Amino acid sequence: MGRHSDNSLQESANHTVLLTSPTNTIPKDSRQRSQQFMQNLQDEICTALEQLDGKASFHQDHWERAEGGEGRTRVIREGRVFEQGGVNFSAVWGNSLPASILAQRPEAAGHEFFATGTSMVLHPRNPYVPTVHLNYRYFEAGPIWWFGGGADLTPYYAFKEDAVHFHQTLKNACDVHNPEYYPTFKRWCDEYFYLRHREEQRGIGGIFFDYQDASGKLYVESQTDSSVAIYSQKVGNVARNWEDIFAFVQSCGQAFLPAYLPIVERRQGIEYGDRQRNFQLYRRGRYVEFNLVYDRGTVFGLQTKGRTESILMSLPPLARWEYCYEPEAGSPEAELTEVFLQPRDWV
């Protein structure tokens, strides 16, 4: 990992400090601290993944954004374990807010913005090893701020113990901060990673959250009758400040490696053939569809004129589509979509 530049990226100018109430105050060093955490998370994940793969290494591209900001894109390809994967870090700022942000938070209009985050997608070679996604981010626009993120698992073959392990590890990280975090954000994850045009879940979920700030609301979306909306209404508002939520996000980020690596180690040696490989490529097509149609990070990146190669690094190197494909009844492939991907309480 020594070839990776660890020079700290510069914090943007004109950092607004909010002084309205103790619970909603933005620390003076909020941008520096959030940015540093995202960089460190990228470093830790890349180091561990290289050690696990044992063959391939991450290639880094450092890029700059003309409107303000820069980042580090790291891609691993043709490895022993990982066919392709990427771990991105970025910190961007500017005066023009993208439409995707204004649609959700119109009160941010008129303010310069700052956004930093780390995102990751790994596409393993072996179909028995699940694809995994992680994203944690922080956003500021004048007095408006929030954290978002999560991690989710997309298996191609059903292993209950893997799903339980992944969810339990994330739940443990959440429970340290609030026992209502996991049940709320698990439901939100099931809602978010859903392909409406296919009426299918993308995977077995994990946790997902967005717009987490001092307002106290755990679920911040327009739906009022979904499972997560109803659950969040029962929970009510949760008193938190910037430091509370930042600590929670750090715990979630640090839970990724113990949540995912044991699964890879259990499954990477299982033998597979053309049938399993073809099904993996077919299901990867669903991943492509979600990321290009629904993913907020993709939309935000393209609307803010981010680096296109970095934004689309989440896509797999190979995928396939087959007209009106139907898996054989009773097969492991049929079990995945008919049974295993249906939302449930894993822990």
UniProtKB/Swiss-Prot annotation:
UniProt keywords, alphabetically: Cytoplasm, Oxidoreductase, Porphyrin biosynthesis
Catalytic activity: coproporphyrinogen III + O2 + 2 H(+) = protoporphyrinogen IX + 2 CO2 + 2 H2O
One Pfam short name: Coprogen_oxidas
Known EC number: 1.3.3.3
UniProt pathway annotation: Porphyrin-containing compound metabolism; protoporphyrin-IX biosynthesis; protoporphyrinogen-IX from coproporphyrinogen-III (O2 route): step 1/1
Region (Disordered): 1-31
Residues flagged as site, Important for dimerization: 197
Binding locations of substrate: 119, 135-137, 305-310
A GO cellular component entry from the record: cytoplasm
Domain of life: Bacteria
Keyword Calcium belongs to the record: no
Enzyme class, first EC level, given as a word: oxidoreductase
Keyword Secreted attributed: no
Molecular-function GO terms, alphabetical: coproporphyrinogen oxidase activity; protein homodimerization activity
UniProt biased composition (Polar residues): 7-31
SUPFAM superfamilies reported in the protein's UniProt record: Coproporphyrinogen III oxidase
Record-linked InterPro entries: Coprogen_oxidase_aer (IPR001260), Coprogen_oxidase_aer_sf (IPR036406), Coprogen_oxidase_CS (IPR018375)
Positions annotated as active site in the UniProt record: 133 (proton donor)
Gene Ontology biological-process entries: chlorophyll biosynthetic process; protoporphyrinogen IX biosynthetic process
Family: Belongs to the aerobic coproporphyrinogen-III oxidase family.
Record's subunit section: Homodimer.
Name of the protein this chain belongs to: Coproporphyrinogen-III oxidase, aerobic 2
Source organism of the structure: Nostoc sp. (strain PCC 7120 / SAG 25.82 / UTEX 2576)
